[in-house]
A protein has these predicted regions:
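Helix-turn-helix
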Residues: 23, 27, 31, 35-69, ...
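Short secondary-structure transition hinges
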Residues: 111-149, 153, 167
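N-terminal intrinsically disordered/low-complexity leader segments
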Residues: 1-23, 34
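Hydrophobic alpha-helical connector segments
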Residues: 73, 87-118, 169-173
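Short amphipathic alpha-helical elements of helix-turn-helix/winged-helix folds
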Residues: 31-35, 112, 176
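Short, basic, alpha-helical segments at the C-terminal edge of helix-turn-helix-like DNA-binding modules
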Residues: 76-82
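Short alpha-helical scaffolding segments that buttress acidic/His motifs in well-ordered protein cores
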Residues: 106-109, 123-126, 173, 177, ...
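Hydrophobic/aromatic-rich alpha-helical bundle segments in the mid-to-C-terminal region
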Residues: 134-135, 142, 156-202
Length: 211
């Protein structure tokens, strides 16, 4: 007779119990995002990833083929969610009101980032290294950049926004997100864990960009 203890030994390391509920794809990708954010791409092993996902030790190899392919799937999913939310905000406002569209998109971007601090941590980590992974991230960001850039250009041309380069606008909008991705430091400065301050942050950023 096979005992429960024997069955547990035979499952092997990293393999979930046979009757354990499997996470859905969104949960798998979210757990992967958290693992890459907390441990770093180079430091985390495939075995650690599978354990963090709650899957068997061959899951990533069987489903994605490699750690790199899994990382790409994780980042594609996370950035797509942000892109969809910000693009929807852009499209909600009247096409002729560029200022309202830009304001709505910045607010939506900060709100989306506040809910996804692990995404910002991964991007910050990769942004300091000239690598194929950074090039891949930039490609994923391109649809949102392509949608927002014409609005930015028109507002600069008409004098509503300060006459600044596009790259400066990008960093002015994105770098304050450290408040969400660096939660332990923000906590030391007195930011409550349940703070709902993304709207205030957006207002401060926009006020600094408007003429």
């Amino acid at each position: 007779m096979t005992t429960g203890r024997t069955a547990q030994r035979r499952r092997g390391p990293g393999r979930p119990p046979a009757d354990a509920p499997l996470p859905d794809l969104e949960e798998i990708l979210q757990r992967g995002l958290e693992a890459f954010a907390e441990l770093g791409y180079e430091a985390v092993s495939v075995r650690q990833l599978n354990e963090r996902l709650g899957m068997g030790h061959t899951f990533i190899h069987d489903r994605y083929g490699s750690k790199e392919a899994f990382w790409q799937a994780v980042m594609e999913s996370a950035i797509r969610h942000v892109t969809d939310e910000v693009t929807a905000a852009l499209d909600t406002e009247q096409p002729v009101d560029d200022l309202a569209r830009l304001t709505a998109s910045v607010r939506a971007f900060h709100q989306a980032a506040a809910r996804r601090p692990h995404l910002t941590r991964v991007i910050n980590y990769e942004a300091g290294r000239d690598s194929p992974r950074l090039a891949y991230l930039y490609t994923l960001m391109s649809p949102l950049n392509d949608a927002a850039r014409p609005v930015f250009d028109r507002l600069v041309h008409e004098g509503t926004l300060r006459d600044i380069p596009w790259y400066l606008f990008h960093f002015a909008v994105t770098k304050p997100l450290a408040m969400y991705s660096q939660a332990p430091l923000a906590r030391l400065f007195g930011r409550p864990d349940d703070a709902d301050d993304h709207t205030l942050l957006s207002t401060l950023v926009l006020n600094g960009l408007l003429t």
